[in-house]
């Protein structure tokens, strides 16, 4: 076999990685959380992908559209330091740690990594009715405790995030379990909810068939 043939075979076996694609094993918890909305996995989240992500989770069209506009317009510039304005409002997943807001739980550190002690603090401080779950009222009290009166944007963002989370992931008793809250931080809950919704839709279609 000639050297040229070996070289060609080597190239065929080692395709170049897709531009912007991230190595999931090396991603921080926050990057994994954000990457759920990177529907084509190119390392960038556009407004229509944010919309598609929220629709996949089961939100209505109007809410998904509003959230997509709010998130991408608000975070795009922060995740693209040194780059010019883009009317497409892209969010760079690898720089998602640059858009963390105040008035939150501090479960992510400055680099977007998961902080176990801060996570445990949520339930140690605020889970009064059940040690491993939060009621809607307890979530409201937690948000009030974390709120910085001079950080309106951060408080509104945190309120919206927890409101949507509770709506999508609460159990039949209206409780948000510790397991679900933990899974939201690395985005694994998103995948679980999408899979569950997809399965329900498939069963519904089968039942409608004559």
Curated annotation (Swiss-Prot):
Domain (EF-hand): residue spans on this chain: 25-60
Keyword field: Calcium, Heme, Iron, Metal-binding, Oxidoreductase, Phosphoprotein, Secreted
Cofactor note: Binds 1 heme b (iron(II)-protoporphyrin IX) group.
Cofactor(s) this protein cannot do without: heme b; Ca(2+)
UniProt subcellular location: Secreted
E.C. number(s) listed in UniProt: 1.11.2.3
Keyword check for Calcium: yes
Region feature Disordered, mapped onto this chain: 1-24
Key word DNA repair present: no
GO cellular component: extracellular region
Binding site for heme: 33
Family under the similarity heading: Belongs to the caleosin family.
Quaternary structure, from the entry: Homodimer.
Domain observations: Transmembrane regions are predicted by sequence analysis tools, but these regions probably constitute hydrophobic domains associated to phospholipids.
Name of the featured protein: Probable peroxygenase 7
Organism in which the protein naturally occurs: Arabidopsis thaliana
Gene expressing this chain: PXG7
């Amino acid at each position: 076999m000639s050297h040229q043939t070996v070289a060609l075979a080597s190239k065929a076996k080692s395709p170049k990685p897709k531009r912007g694609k991230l190595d999931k094993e090396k991603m921080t918890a926050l990057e994994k959380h954000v990457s759920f909305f990177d529907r084509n996995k190119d390392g960038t989240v556009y407004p229509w992908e944010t919309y598609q992500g929220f629709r996949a989770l089961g939100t209505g069209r109007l809410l998904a559209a509003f959230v997509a506009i709010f998130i991408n317009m608000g975070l795009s510039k922060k995740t693209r330091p040194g780059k010019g304005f883009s009317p497409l409002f892209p969010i760079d997943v690898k720089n998602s740690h640059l858009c963390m807001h105040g008035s939150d739980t501090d479960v992510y550190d400055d680099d977007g990594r998961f902080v176990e002690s801060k996570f445990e603090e949520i339930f140690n401080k605020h889970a009064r009715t059940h040690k491993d779950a939060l009621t809607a009222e307890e979530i409201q009290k937690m948000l009030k405790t974390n709120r910085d009166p001079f950080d309106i944007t951060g408080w509104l963002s945190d309120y919206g995030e927890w409101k949507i989370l509770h709506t999508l992931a609460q159990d039949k008793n209206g409780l948000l379990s510790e397991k679900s809250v933990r899974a939201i931080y690395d985005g694994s809950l998103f995948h679980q909810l999408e899979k569950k919704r997809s399965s329900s839709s498939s069963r519904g279609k089968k039942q409608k068939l004559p």
